[in-house]
Swiss-Prot record:
PROSITE patterns: GTP_CYCLOHYDROL_1_1. GO terms for molecular function: GTP binding; GTP cyclohydrolase I activity; zinc ion binding. Keywords: GTP-binding, Hydrolase, Metal-binding, Nucleotide-binding, One-carbon metabolism, Zinc. Zn(2+) binds at residues 75, 78, 146. This is GTP cyclohydrolase 1. One of its GO terms (biological process) is tetrahydrofolate biosynthetic process. Belongs to the GTP cyclohydrolase I family. It catalyses: GTP + H2O = 7,8-dihydroneopterin 3'-triphosphate + formate + H(+). Homomer.
């Protein structure tokens, strides 16, 4: 029979020589398993469930920007967190996405094992697909604990990734407007 996640955590902790019966570690394997399940809960969600018909008709074709959306994810290489914020912009063509759904799309993908570059593109392509937007821009900036706690141990480094689709890629003035709105 396959071991439970809590049993796997117990084995991992025991492999360090720790005593699972000491007061500070009693229950830790179960808590760690519950935390990991939450941190990877994006695998159990679909775009359809997250968006949940929150697309609304709109005559606006002006840029929509949501910035400073907090996020956390687990790097697929070391399973250590990266923590940061996302900035999303899009140009609607007849419909707009409910504001909270932008954040929920980010959370759905962030709660999976992956890399920041992939997360950025997943968010951009999903918003483009769901809204039919003329263009989408996504920028994510994050600190990676895999670089801060181990390896080169650089605590002040920030990684920035971007995905520009449609008019955000093809039109310099659209991209410039997006970047200017992020800096105000």
């Amino acid at each position: 029979m396959k071991p439970t996640p809590a049993e796997l955590y117990a084995n991992l902790i025991s492999s360090t020589g720790e005593d699972l019966q000491r007061p500070g570690l009693q229950g830790t394997p179960a808590r760690a398993a519950t935390a990991f399940e939450y941190l990877t809960s994006g695998y159990k969600q679909s775009v359809q469930e997250v968006v949940n018909d929150a697309l609304f008709p709109s005559d606006s074709n002006d840029m929509v920007v949501v910035r400073d959306i907090e996020l956390f994810s687990l790097c697929e290489h070391h399973m250590l967190p990266f923590i940061g914020k996302a900035h999303v912009g899009y140009i609607p063509t007849g419909k707009v996405l409910g504001l909270s759904k932008v954040a929920r799309i980010i959370d759905m993908y962030a709660r999976r094992l992956q890399i920041q570059e992939q997360l950025t593109h997943q968010v951009a392509s999903t918003i483009a697909e769901v809204t039919g937007a003329a263009g989408v821009g996504v920028i994510i900036e994050a600190k990676h604990l895999c670089m801060m706690m181990r390896g080169v141990e650089k605590q002040n480094s920030v990684m920035k990734t971007s995905a520009m689709l449609g008019s955000f890629r093809a039109n310099l003035s659209t991209r410039s407007e997006f970047l200017a709105l992020l800096n105000n």
